[in-house]
Amino acid sequence: MKYAVKVIASAAYPLMFLLACQVVVAQDRTVKDGIFTEAQVNAGEVVYDASCKTCHNMRFYRDTLKSWNNQPLIYLWETIMGTMPADNPGSLLLEEYTDVIAYILSENGFPAGDMKLDPDNGMDVIHILSP
C-alpha cells in the first residue's frame, strides 16, 4: 500500500508543477491586452492636459515606452509617480497617475478593455511593449 501511495505522489508532483507554471504564464499580460478602461483614458486626458502637457508631448511618451520595452508597467508607474509633475512630484492622487498611464497607452495605440488598471492588482505582471 505504501508503495502505491509513493507512486501516485511521485506522479502527481510533475503534474502540479506544470499546472503551477500555466497559472504563472496565464497571469503575465502586456499593454496590448486591454488592461485599462475607456473611462480611465478619459480621466487621464483631463489630468494630462492639466499637469503633463506643458512639458511632455506624446512623442516623448512614445520614445519613453520604447525604452521601457518588456519591463513591468509598475516600474513606469512608480517612476512617473515619484518624479512628476516636476515642480511637485507625487502631488497627484494615485488614481490620477494610473489614469494618465491609461491615457498615454491609449494615445500610443494600445487598446482599452473591460479591466480597470490598478497598481495594487497585477501591474507588476503587465509588460510594456514598444508602440
Task: Give the positions of each predicted feature.
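The canonical Cys-X-X-Cys-His
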Residues: 44, 48-58, 100, 104
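Sequence context surrounding c-type heme c attachment/ligation sites in exported
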Residues: 42-49, 65-74, 94
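Short, non-ligating residues that shape and space the ligands of small metal-coordination modules
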Residues: 61-62
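Electrostatic cytochrome c docking/interface patches
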Residues: 24-47
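Bacterial N-terminal signal peptides
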Residues: 10-20
